[in-house]
UniProtKB/Swiss-Prot annotation:
Origin species: Legionella pneumophila (strain Paris)
Entries under Pfam families matching the protein: Glutaminase
GO-annotated biological processes: glutamate biosynthetic process; glutamine catabolic process
Signal peptide region: none
Name the record gives this protein: Glutaminase
Length: 310
């Protein structure tokens, strides 16, 4: 099976094909997320050893990380504490439930099923070392390391998250009642809401998937940013849990480990070949970008990037 050349023209074709799908809508349970252009559709690819290519159908603006930010405490804590300790706090099993499921935690707790669920990310945020401002500085350090630059927190989204995040509060209190929250509920949730409220441009989202694709090395300088062990574990979790109860469908269609967010960002990795980010705020009931999945599937087929292909 021959593959196409990776060109701007190919990316443009993928965007225009995705635009034909009018399903989904912006996430409205976090009110500020509804205030975006729902027709925005974009893709960027960083092939290892080559220049970045990107195409968007509308002017770009910063978009919040939402659940793509769950990669930050996962990777940071893996690097600092190691896998054995991290797996004392969360499991790494696909859940088959939605990203904010309380039932799953009640039935199969006290450990959350995996770090990509809200409960898992909240549990990991409670294990960030330090107290108060020290924990926020830890978060800023790892944001800068994983994005190769500083990012800002969108204050309106942060306030919106805090105002409407009652389900996440329920998860945090349930974790606390099961002795699996390592810090104060309110302080932990402030960290979690801040994590989701960092915002980035499309090109800024590319650094992390490119590093993961490159065995933890900076794609430009070759500097070892993350250990190979952390990359291996992170990619395995993305491949099995990155799109919640739609991960299996995603992997069958694309063969790319990925992590989605309800803001419309999805980052994806082709190990040894490329880092990818797609953006479209039209999400489905599972919290995944519909047009984003269309673009990733089209790119995988065009480039023969499915992991199961020789």
């Amino acid at each position: 099976m021959s593959s196409k050349l990776l060109t701007i023209q190919l990316l443009e074709e993928l965007v225009h094909a995705a635009e034909l799908n009018q399903e989904g809508k912006t996430a409205d349970y976090i009110p500020e997320l509804a205030n975006v252009n729902q027709e925005l559709t974009a893709i960027a690819v960083q092939p290892l050893g080559e220049k970045t290519l990107a195409y968007s159908n509308n002017p770009l603006h910063p978009v919040t990380l939402q659940s793509t930010g769950k990669m930050i405490p996962l990777i940071g804590l893996l690097e600092e504490f190691g896998a054995d300790q991290l797996f004392e706090w969360v499991k790494v099993e696909p859940s088959g439930d939605d990203f904010a499921s309380i039932t799953r935690l009640e039935q199969f707790g006290p450990k959350p099923s995996n770090p990509m669920l809200n409960a898992g990310a909240i549990a990991l945020c409670s294990r960030i070392p330090g107290v108060g401002e020290q924990q926020f500085r830890w978060l800023e350090h790892w944001v800068q390391k994983l994005f190769n630059q500083r990012l800002s927190i969108n204050p309106l989204v942060f306030a919106s998250e805090k105002r409407t995040g009652n389900r996440n509060r329920a998860l945090a209190y349930l974790l606390k009642s099961r002795s699996n929250l390592g810090a104060d509920v309110h302080e932990t949730l402030d960290l979690y809401f801040a994590l989701c409220s960092y915002e980035a441009m499309l090109d800024q989202m590319l650094y992390l998937p490119a590093v993961l694709a490159n065995k933890g090395q900076d794609p430009d300088t070759g500097e070892q940013i993350l250990s190979i062990e952390t990359c291996k574990i992170t990619l395995a979790i993305m491949a099995t849990c990155g799109l919640y109860d739609e991960t299996g469908t995603h992997m069958v269609k694309t063969g790319m480990p990925a992590k989605s967010g309800v803001s419309g960002y999805t980052i994806a990795v082709v190990p040894g070949k490329a880092g990818i980010v797609v953006l479209s705020p039209r999400v489905n009931a599972k919290g995944n970008s519909i047009r984003g999945e269309i673009m990733l599937e089209g790119l995988s087929k065009a480039m023969n990037w499915h992991f199961a292909l020789p």
